[in-house]
Amino acid sequence: MNRLCGGLVATITVLAMAGCGSSGLVTPTTVSVVSAEELTLGADAYRQFCSDCHGEDVRGTDKGPSFLSQVYEPNHHADAAFQLAVQRGSPQHHWNFGDMPPVEGIAPDELEAIVTYVRGVQAELGFID
């Protein structure tokens, strides 16, 4: 777990630094600082609420899709789409797993941390920039 959090923090740091071009000009970049505590909360909440269907490694199961699909890139499914799917459920539309029911019992800070965790894993695996 510590290795994953360290890797995610390092990935986020590298992504923040990627805005510097060779011309010496800095390209404006929005960077959010993610604490180790938030990543831990996200990982723990993901395991508790999401991993049965989406896999311990975000690669999916026979019950739900992988988050390493172009469907889940930020420009296709924004963070808000993840949050709404958890809160309201989601009708089957990309996969043949059936409808996703709303997930009960997730606190707002846990939900935000889950999305941050999933995006961090996607970045660490080279799935998103």
Where do the model's predicted regions map?
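Bacterial N-terminal signal peptides that target proteins for export
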Residues: M1-V9
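Secreted/luminal cysteine- and crosslink-motif detector
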Residues: G6, G21, S51-H54
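Short functional linear motifs
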Residues: G6, L39, P108-L111
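C-terminal motif of bacterial Sec signal peptides marking the signal peptidase cleavage site
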Residues: A16-G19
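Electrostatic cytochrome c docking/interface patches
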Residues: G21-A45, D129
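Gly/Gly-Pro-rich "capping" loops immediately C-terminal to redox-active cysteine motifs
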Residues: V33-L39, E56-Q87, P102
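The canonical Cys-X-X-Cys-His
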Residues: G42-E56, V86, M100, I114-V118
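Axial heme c-ligation environment in periplasmic c-type cytochrome domains
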Residues: T61-Q70, R88-V121, G126-D129
